[in-house]
Amino acid sequence: MISVGQYSKLKVSKKVDFGYYLEDNFGDEVLLPNSAAKGHEIKEGDQLEVFIYRDSKDRMISTLKKPLLTVGEIGYLEVVSQNNIGAFVNFGLERDLFVPLKEQSYKLKEGKKYLFYMYVDKTDRLAATTRIHSYLDIAEEGKYKVSDEVNAIVYEINENATLNVAIDGEYRGLILANEHFEYIYPGQEIKGRVKRIYEDGTIGVTTRKKRLEARSELSETILNYLKENGGFMPYNDKSSPEDIKREFNTSKNYFKMTLGGLMREKLITQDKEGTRLL
């Protein structure tokens, strides 16, 4: 049986002006257009592995080109257009992949990339959804360990600001609200490290740098700020957490510890107005 969204190994049954007809063991045929066979020498009787999809006229056709994902897989794809019924994303073939409006769990933007799961809808057409959570795997025991560096892509932001992320594009992970500081949006790629592994196998990730590295970077940031502003800044260890996060993108606790370290090194002093460079 020839199925949309999958690879099939088919035999070339005949050549026509506009392409080749391929058939399976049951005699079912599908067209391989000339445009989808460019660069390949093909003759009758050849066995070809082709991807099956529907063209703009809704006809089932095949191609030797490799799509970015097949049915049942998750891919990181770019949105190429959006209208009042849905969006279209590039999955590597001539025809773009449709994402119905009801399958968009957040607003998609043209030119941005997001994670999508591809499926076949009730009309036997290819479609995609941003609702990928149930299709992500749980990492097997031992695949990741605490402190491992990982690549993550955000696919959901919860009301408490916890981020659901896909680790390496296929495993379930999360980043708690206190483990990230910057504004993060769906589809964003993040580099982090494993902080813990939950009982259900979900990977807990942090974007925080290791303490010494983070404090060293923050010290440099504070000193540069002071040098660029005449040796003074209107922030000290009494400043509000909101002001500190807005200006230095860090927590008040880290800010206070870093100021304390700079004072011990006799590089700065604090007063009620702020902090001064020595």
Where does each model-flagged region fall?
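Single-stranded RNA-binding regions, centering on S1/OB-family and related RNA-binding modules
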Residues: 1-278
